[in-house]
Each structure stands twice: as C-alpha cells, then as structure tokens.
Amino acid sequence: LQTDRKEDAMNILITNIGRRGYLVDFIKENADFKGKVFVSDCDNTASGLYGTNDGFFILPKPVENEILYVKSLINVCKQNNIDAVLPVIDPEIYILSNYRSNFSEEGIKVIVSDRRVLDICFNKIKMNEFLEHIGVLYPKTYDTIQNFKSALEQGVIEFPVILKPIYGSGSIETCIVKDIRQLELLFHDGMIIQQRISGIEYGCDIFNTFEGKTIRCVIKKKIAMRSGETDKSITVKNENVKKVALYLGKKLGHIANLDCDMIEEGENVYVIDLNPRFGGGYPATHLSGVNLLSILIKLLEGKDVEPEYDDYKENLLVMKDISLKSVVLD
C-alpha cells in the first residue's frame, strides 16, 4: 500500500486500534479534513481494522519486540506519507515515548507525552506523589499489607478497600476487598490497597496543546462500566470537578488528551486515575459537540485553538451498543 500526499492534507495512523474504529469515523466526518486515516493492529481480527479507514496494517506486538515494532511502524509511515501516529493503548504509548526522536527525524509526529508525564500516569504511587505535591486529593493508599494493617488498627482506614496493580490498565486485577482474610489471599507484590471513596464518579477529557496548555475540558458522569471502559455516561457541568480538572491539566502539562477519573464525595473531589490518551469515554465527549480529534489535527497543522471549557451539550446520555461485522480473511 503506497499513498501519495495531497497538498494541505494530514495523514494519520491510529495504532493498535482494537475495537475503536469509531475514531476513524470521528476524524472523517469533519468536512475540512482532506487527508487519509490509516489504522494498525497486531491482531488481524481486530474489528477496528475493518471500516471506513483508508488502509490497515498488521504489525508486530509492541511489547514482544519493541525495536522490531518501531522499525516496522516507521517503515509503514514512510511508505504511506503518514504525518502523525496516534497510539491508543497504554503499553504502546510508553514504548513509543522512548522513540519519539526516531520518528521526528523522519518528519513524523508521535502523539505521546514526555516520560515524566507517563511515569506519573502509569505508576499509581508516583501519581499519588504528584497529586500530593500539587495539593489534589486522592484515596489513601498503601503498598504493603503491614502499612495497611497499621492504618487499620489506628482507625485511619476501614474495609471495604480497593485492591489494584501499581501499573494497571483496563481495571485488570482491580477488585473490592471486604476483609483481611480476602486481602491476604489476593495481595501480592506490585499491588496497592486503596481507600474506597463513596461518591459520584466522573470521567473527564482534559485536552492540552503541544505546549501543555489546557484548551478543552468535558465532564461526564459515569453510569456503567464494562471491562474497565466506560459503557454508559451522561455529560454534565460541575464547577468543583472542572476546577480540579483545569488545575490538573496545567500542572501535569501533558499533550493532547488526558482521560481522568475522579470521584466527588461531598465537597471533596478525588483523582483516582490518569490515562494520557483517548480513552473509552471519549465518544461521549465527541457526541456532545467537542471534536478533540479535529482540534488535534489543527494543532498538528500549526493552527491556534482558543480555550473553551463549557461549550458542549449537557445531559447527553451516551451508550455503547453491540454492532456486528464480518469480513472474509485472506
């Protein structure tokens, strides 16, 4: 597959697309977009490969051989005049952050934040240290059973608690633990024990420029989750949550989108997760009238985008449905 470049056209490659074929549709629905959208995955049965894209590529698994993966990805980009690579899964984002200069030497922009930001987002302990430093609330957290037991005896924390990996994605191994016996059975190195906050959970898309300036913020109240991903949500406007989100965007200084999870309990807003990418809750943001992908392309084209934080539809219920696809494999 060889692609000729059109004047004033931006060609995008979304990597490890998985089931997120809707991202292609979201880019292409913009009448001003004149470029092409390609996708890739390591699995030729990924549903996102088959849709409205302008071509797809099967690439090696990034976590198995990152050097081979990066080399293959750069070759695909050069052969198809791809201007920007947009990764949407955590392990690949971390890998590609190490090779940004390799891509930039070929004139290709990889949409990933710097290593400092990624270390904060992917390591729950470092995330909490960062939140502590900037004065943002987070659940009480313990990385050993001994420390947790001491806090339990002092009445600082109580069951039930949340058990999750320090490095986690998609709620894998995350569970609610009701007593010490269950905790001792499930806990192992590389996990943390967290206070369970009772309140309203929100997902926020906090979008920054390449200079780390926050220009968009959309808040959604979570209604249902499926496999660690938002399944149903409703767009809301909440000044307490927005204040924390904008402050967080400024202090973290990420680029492009940050998918942030928060819980509001009374007047307190706790940050519980940071994902430096387009997350599973992005469709609600898009359907509410905020096309962050189009904004991203404008930034890639060197255009200025003014901040706007409240220009989206409120009380919009967004639900994911099951659709079916079939293709004949070669």
Task: Tell where the protein language model's regions lie, with residue ranges.
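ATP-dependent carboxylate activation and anion-phosphoryl transfer catalytic cores
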Residues: 80, 237-330
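Active-site nucleotide/adenylate-binding loops and adjacent lid/helix of ATP-dependent enzymes
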Residues: 117-200, 210-213, 239
